């Protein structure tokens, strides 16, 4: 969903470098490959606990880029910045806040995806006859099922 949202944003906002944004969207969580242990355990590795997927992803991408002869250095920095800034805020784990439009767009798409996935999980667990579902810390709101969402699930 994150990549699809980024394609939409790139198609609607000409200031965005589509290639950079879509590449960043595809690879923004690549660090989770080494942050988490193999399936079915999916526990955090020691490196994952100590460094986190954001830093690990930027490092992995940086290492791969260095293997590509002639890769533009500024583009390499911008791609790594998008990965480092994709959580948007320092308190959400990003070592950097978005400083370029593509990093900001990626953050919006990733944040929207995470919050709507949370809402989906809350709705899926809820009784369709219960309107108010309580406060959720992640979305920072008291959650209510919309009539349309209940109708879709009947």
Task: Give the ranges of each region predicted by the language model.
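Short, surface-exposed polybasic-aromatic patches that bind anionic ligands, especially phosphate groups
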Residues: 2
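Divalent metal-dependent catalytic cores for phosphoryl transfer on phosphate-bearing substrates
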Residues: 7-126
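N-terminal intrinsically disordered, cationic/polar leader segments
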Residues: 107, 129-137, 146-154
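C-terminal membrane module of polytopic membrane proteins
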Residues: 113, 138, 143-144
């Amino acid at each position: 969903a994150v990549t699809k949202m980024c394609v939409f944003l790139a198609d609607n906002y000409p200031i965005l470098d589509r290639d950079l944004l879509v590449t960043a969207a595809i690879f923004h969580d690549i660090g989770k490959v080494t942050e988490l242990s193999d399936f079915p355990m999916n526990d955090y590795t020691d490196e994952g606990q100590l460094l986190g997927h954001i830093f690990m992803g930027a490092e992995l991408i940086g290492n791969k880029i260095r293997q590509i002869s002639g890769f533009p250095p500024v583009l390499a920095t911008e791609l790594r910045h998008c990965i480092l800034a994709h959580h948007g805020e320092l308190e959400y784990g990003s070592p950097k806040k978005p400083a370029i439009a593509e990093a900001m767009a990626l953050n919006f798409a990733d944040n929207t995806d995470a919050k709507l996935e949370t809402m989906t999980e809350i709705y899926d667990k809820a009784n369709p006859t219960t309107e108010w579902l309580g406060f959720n810390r992640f979305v920072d709101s008291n959650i209510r099922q919309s009539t349309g969402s209940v109708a879709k699930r009947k």
